Amino acid sequence: MPRGRCRQQGPRIPIWAAANYANAHPWQQMDKASPGVAYTPLVDPWIERPCCGDTVCVRTTMEQKSTASGTCGGKPAERGPLAGHMPSSRPHRVDFCWVPGSDPGTFDGSPWLLDRFLAQLGDYMSFHFEHYQDNISRVCEILRRLTGRAQAWAAPYLDGDLPLPDDYELFCQDLKEVVQDPNSFAEYHAVVTCPLPLASSQLPVAPQLPVVRQYLARFLEGLALDMGTAPRSLPAAMATPAVSGSNSVSRSALFEQQLTKESTPGPKEPPVLPSSTCSSKPGPVEPASSQPEEAAPTPVPRLSESANPPAQRPDPAHPGGPKPQKTEEEVLETEGDQEVSLGTPQEVVEAPETPGEPPLSPGF
């Protein structure tokens, strides 16, 4: 089959105008949001998976076109870039989404939409010349949407009588002249009225901006997947080890506190606890005031009596040897006083084993 010929797919009935070009866009195919689509749109592989691997698929140079034209069967005529058809202020690769019902059948509502359409139509032929045959079928689908004189003008290309010219800039210029003719869409205007006036400066897609934003969001997601960028959930995943590390630090701190509490010697606490207990109970306070010299060593004999061997207790608390001998002498002195005051030395022996609690006297 010649390079310019393409078989007609479906009946030769004007489906929509050229303004409904987005019906053939892969985004429209993805969410099925476009009414009035009467065929399965084709998908260009370079749109979804850029061959160059870059986010912006740049036009191939004339040398690349000439080398790739050998596989296509003919050398294309050199032409300039289509930058004149598309304003430089607008992004090159963000495809404009035609929404059905917005300015149908004409480009008169905003002239730059026609330039955008022509630039996109030319990009199918110029971005990657190795996809020339696939782009021809796509261009034929776009041309089939033209009505009136535009459809009659595109009929030879659709029938395959005329091949699509390699000089695609000339083709776009001819198409622009046909589309700008006010009589080009007479058949379409007879059926559907244009929702916007011809001289309106408002963009025909203004009511459809939320839909366009959704398409742009999906386009950015597709670019992120193609480029292999890391998902946004990575910062949250990186934050989880930090939380677990803080938990481990807090657990280790608690464990160290428990160790320090267990390792602290017992005799350090009694000087604090007896003062509080003695202040609450008036019984032990009187002998302490009457005998100031014996008030300090009074808790020591009770501890030594509760722990029967006196040599085992001083080892962790007091490693020195002379202190156990002093406590034994004081024990003998205090036992006589306690027998006189309390009268029941056995109850003193049966006091709680905790080093900080003083003996409870039943008389008081």
UniProtKB/Swiss-Prot annotation:
Its main location: mitochondrion. The gene is RTL10. Changing residue 120 to A: No effect on interaction with VDAC1. Interacts (via BH3 domain) with VDAC1. Interacts with pro-survival Bcl-2 family members, BCL2, BCL2L1 isoform Bcl-X(L), MCL1, BCL2A1 and BCL2L2. Interacts with BAX and BAK1. The keyword Mitochondrion applies. The keyword Ubl conjugation does not apply. The BH3 motif is required for pro-apoptotic activity and for interaction with pro-survival Bcl-2 family members. It comes from Homo sapiens (Human). Keywords: Apoptosis, Mitochondrion. Could induce apoptosis in a BH3 domain-dependent manner. The direct interaction network of Bcl-2 family members may play a key role in modulation RTL10/BOP intrinsic apoptotic signaling activity. A motif (BH3) lies at residues 114-128. Residues 311-322, 355-364 have a biased composition (Pro residues). Signal peptide: none annotated. It is found in: Mitochondrion. Residues 66-88, 258-364 are annotated as: Disordered. This is Protein Bop. Ubiquitously expressed. InterPro entries: DUF4939 (IPR032549). GO terms for biological process: mitochondrial outer membrane permeabilization; regulation of mitochondrial membrane potential. One of its GO terms (cellular component) is mitochondrion.
